[in-house]
């Protein structure tokens, strides 16, 4: 078992411009919400910066397997998230659409609370850099 206390993501070249809501969330493989961070609301997030936010309470894993972490920012200019493209766009997108989908967009129109469960994931050809600790 592992105890998770926080989630981290790294911003890329675009800093947050006038954020109104921002949080991270932890989901199981069925996209059921396990924990989330408090809404960081209007706190700034500079470009090229690691941001670590504590969960509202710790989570201890009880099963091995796939977990998802999510990031949400509502802002006039959301950050760009540091990510790595998987490869040639057409070929890599086809690969990333194989189950289980490991990265992509999910629920939309969010503000201060993570959805439970999160919507189906639309695959992306790049992987965001984020982790739990």
PLM feature segments, named:
Residues 72-133:
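Short, surface-exposed beta-strand/loop patches at domain edges
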Residues 2-14, 69:
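A short beta-strand element within beta-rich, extracytoplasmic domains
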Residues 2, 46-50, 105-110:
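A short linear-motif detector with a strong N-terminal bias
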Residues 1, 28, 39, 112, ...:
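Acidic-enriched, low-complexity/disordered segments with a strong bias for Aspartate over Glutamate
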Residues 18-98:
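Aromatic- and Gly/Pro-enriched, solvent-exposed loop/edge beta-strand patches characteristic
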Residues 3-8, 52-54, 58-60, 80, ...:
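Ser/Thr- (and often Asn-) enriched beta-sheet segments in non-cytosolic proteins
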């Amino acid at each position: 078992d592992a105890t998770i206390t926080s989630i981290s993501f790294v911003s890329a070249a675009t800093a947050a411009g006038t954020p109104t809501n921002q949080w991270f969330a932890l989901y199981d493989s069925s996209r059921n919400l396990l924990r989330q961070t408090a809404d960081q609301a209007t706190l700034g997030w500079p470009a090229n910066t690691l941001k670590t936010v504590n969960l509202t309470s710790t989570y201890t894993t009880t099963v091995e397997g796939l977990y998802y972490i999510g990031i949400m920012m509502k802002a006039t200019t959301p950050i760009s998230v540091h990510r790595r493209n998987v490869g040639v766009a057409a070929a890599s997108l086809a690969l990333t659409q194989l189950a289980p989908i490991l990265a992509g967009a999910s629920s939309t129109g969010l503000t201060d609370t993570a959805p439970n469960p999160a919507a189906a994931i639309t695959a992306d050809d790049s992987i965001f850099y984020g982790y739990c600790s």
